[in-house]
């Protein structure tokens, strides 16, 4: 029996030497058998379950993070303190500048002026000073007209000028025939109609314009007709006097 076994082994060795493909196949089969031994189904199940358990334990922190993120996105049972604790710390200077290093517009905005901080005494003094200047201008207007026309105007200067008669006589006194036709009251009709008053006022303003009074210093018709713009009228009359004085100096 021993001799027969040795003969069989020698025969197999000769066959393997003559057929190298068979040798490589046997070697690969033996390697497979050696590296991957066959085990029972129960052992494989236990190994798989153990492997799955290990994977489950290793991946459980990731799942918890995903669950926390899901709760945070849904806004359910996630307190602001937890969000603040989990969120990364941001320095105060991180948001001080916008893209490309530009500062937000709020940096350039000036603080709103507090109206309550204005001194009421200053407001009253400024108002009184303005009223004093206007009164002086109106008195100067009265003196200029009375001195040139040699008349005494009514105490209510606005009522004395509203029909435009005095103003037309003033411009004709400065430059004769500047206003060709003047509507004047008569004993029968002591008060002119509004249409005639407007015509006198418009003729006066047109004469001032022709004599060289700048447009920005010309008052409007309603400043005279409605007796609400004596300061504007005073500016117009003063400009008219200044223009005529300047022209007389250079002629």
Swiss-Prot record:
Positions bearing Phosphothreonine: 123
Gene3D superfamilies assigned to the protein according to its UniProt record, in alphabetical order: Calponin-like domain
Entries under InterPro entries matching the protein: Calponin-like (IPR050606), CH_dom (IPR001715), CH_dom_sf (IPR036872)
Signal peptide: none
Superkingdom of source: Eukaryota
Start-end of Polar residues biased regions: 88-97
Subunit structure: Interacts (via LRR repeats) with unphosphorylated DOCK8 (via DHR-2 domain); the interaction prevents the interaction between DOCK8 and CDC42.
Protein name, entry field: Leucine-rich repeat and calponin homology domain-containing protein 1
């Amino acid at each position: 029996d021993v001799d027969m076994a040795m003969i069989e082994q020698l025969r197999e060795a000769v066959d393997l030497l003559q057929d190298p493909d068979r040798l490589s196949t046997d070697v690969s089969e033996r390697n497979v058998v050696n590296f991957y031994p066959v085990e029972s189904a129960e052992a494989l199940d236990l190994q798989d379950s153990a492997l799955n358990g290990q994977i489950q334990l290793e991946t459980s922190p990731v799942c918890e993070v995903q669950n926390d993120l899901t709760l945070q996105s849904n806004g359910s049972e996630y307190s602001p303190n937890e969000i603040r604790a989990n969120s990364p710390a941001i320095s105060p200077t991180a948001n001080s500048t916008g893209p490309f290093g530009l500062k937000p517009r709020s940096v350039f905005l000036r603080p709103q002026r507090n109206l309550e901080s204005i001194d009421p005494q200053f407001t009253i003094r400024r108002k009184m000073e303005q009223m004093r200047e206007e009164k002086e201008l109106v008195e100067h207007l009265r003196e200029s007209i009375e001195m040139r026309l040699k008349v005494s105007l009514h105490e209510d200067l606005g009522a004395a000028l509203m029909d435009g008669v005095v103003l037309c006589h003033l411009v004709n006194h400065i430059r004769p025939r500047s206003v060709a036709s003047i509507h004047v009251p008569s004993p029968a009709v002591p008060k002119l109609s509004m249409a005639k008053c407007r015509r006198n006022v418009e003729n006066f303003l047109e004469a001032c314009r022709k004599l060289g009074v700048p447009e920005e210093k010309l008052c409007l018709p309603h400043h005279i007709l409605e007796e609400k713009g004596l300061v504007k009228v005073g500016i117009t009359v003063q400009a008219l006097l200044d223009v005529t004085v300047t022209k007389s100096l250079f002629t």
